[in-house]
């Protein structure tokens, strides 16, 4: 792991075997994995995934924010932690954490702890959007209706001159090209397979590429040092991350490639810090809060997919 310690994965004596689902560790929603397969998948996510790409930048605050606690027991949550793959449950109400539960040792707690770095998955899309809100509020980007016509790499692709809101809504019309996810870097894909591409109907299509383009576009707009400063301002000074939050590159050939993904890594408490910052912006009607309300108002039908 990142701190130099290691966990030796061993199958239980009664193991019925591990299904690796192709070796990636990702299990689709329609599968019914056994307990050993779930543990193996978690092991991959905790100990392999954080190291699978070059890191762009990491941030933690010198004076992290703290939480107030007024804990109560919840029998249903405890039961779910004992019988399902649920790893962690935090409930924040009226300015306090009122439920704080984690997987027990005899389930996944020998691997997963309060300091484990969770892979953001789809939450990374929300965090990316939150950063876009800050970019709009500091004037780096004009608005959600700004057209992506100032980045030469997008020329002669379906993304050129589209409004930013289309990519935020994952409705850029790229469904013909993104049915399967790719580990190839954004810059490489735009310069090769997307040259001459044409957009289809601007309807919702859940994929990673739109968001990876947005993070890499932020890197183009700010520059390397400028985007790292934005991370310092948002995660360090505003949210006041305690442990660490970092963003990896995606498909980079070397550590100098200027191509980003949207997969963040943070602890369970630091994800709550991020969520609380979003809630505070919304409730206080800050500039970023107004941005959040705008994209909520401009959301599009998802045909029952992804909520």
Regions found by a protein language model. Give the residues of each.
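N-terminal leader/targeting segments and the immediately adjacent pre-domain N-terminus
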Residues: 1-111, 138-142
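Active-site-proximal loop and beta-strand segments within enzyme catalytic domains
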Residues: 67, 77-79, 110-115, 119, ...
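Solvent-exposed, acidic/flexible segments
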Residues: 70, 74, 84-85, 116-124, ...
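Active-site SXXK
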Residues: 95, 116-143, 167, 214-218, ...
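Glycine- and aromatic-rich loop/turn segments at beta-sheet edges
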Residues: 101-111, 183-200, 240-257, 303-304
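Active-site helix/loop module of the DD-peptidase/beta-lactamase fold
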Residues: 138-172, 223-261, 266, 283
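Penicillin-binding protein/beta-lactamase superfamily catalytic region
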Residues: 198, 202-204, 229, 247-307
């Amino acid at each position: 792991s990142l701190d130099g310690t290691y966990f030796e994965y061993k199958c239980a004596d009664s193991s019925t075997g591990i299904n690796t689902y192709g070796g990636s560790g990702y299990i689709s929603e329609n599968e019914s994995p056994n307990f050993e397969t779930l543990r193996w998948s978690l092991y991959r996510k905790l100990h392999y995934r954080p190291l699978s790409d070059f890191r762009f930048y990491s941030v933690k605050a010198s004076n992290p924010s703290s939480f107030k606690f007024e804990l109560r027991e919840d029998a249903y949550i405890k039961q779910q932690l004992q019988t399902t793959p649920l790893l962690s449950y935090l409930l924040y109400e009226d300015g306090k954490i009122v439920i704080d539960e984690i997987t027990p040792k005899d389930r996944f707690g020998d691997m997963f702890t309060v300091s484990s770095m969770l892979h953001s998955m789809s939450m990374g899309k929300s965090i990316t959007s939150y950063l876009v809100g800050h970019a709009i509020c500091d004037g780096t980007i004009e608005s959600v209706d700004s057209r992506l016509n100032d980045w030469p790499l997008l020329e002669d692709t379906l993304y050129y001159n589209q409004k930013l809101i289309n990519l935020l809504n994952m409705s850029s019309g790229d469904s013909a090209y993104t049915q399967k996810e790719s580990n190839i870097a954004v810059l490489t894909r735009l310069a090769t397979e997307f040259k001459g591409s044409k957009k289809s109907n601007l309807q919702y299509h859940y994929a990673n590429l739109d968001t990876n383009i947005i993070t890499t576009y932020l890197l183009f707009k700010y520059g390397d040092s400028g985007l790292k400063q934005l991370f310092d301002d948002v995660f360090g000074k505003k949210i006041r991350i305690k442990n660490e939050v970092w963003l990896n590159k995606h498909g980079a050939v070397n550590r100098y490639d200027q191509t980003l993904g949207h997969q963040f890594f943070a602890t369970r408490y630091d994800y709550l810090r991020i969520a609380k910052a979003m809630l505070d912006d919304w409730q206080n009607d800050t500039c970023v809060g107004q941005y959040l309300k705008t994209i909520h108002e401009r959301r599009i039908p998802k045909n029952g997919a992804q909520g």
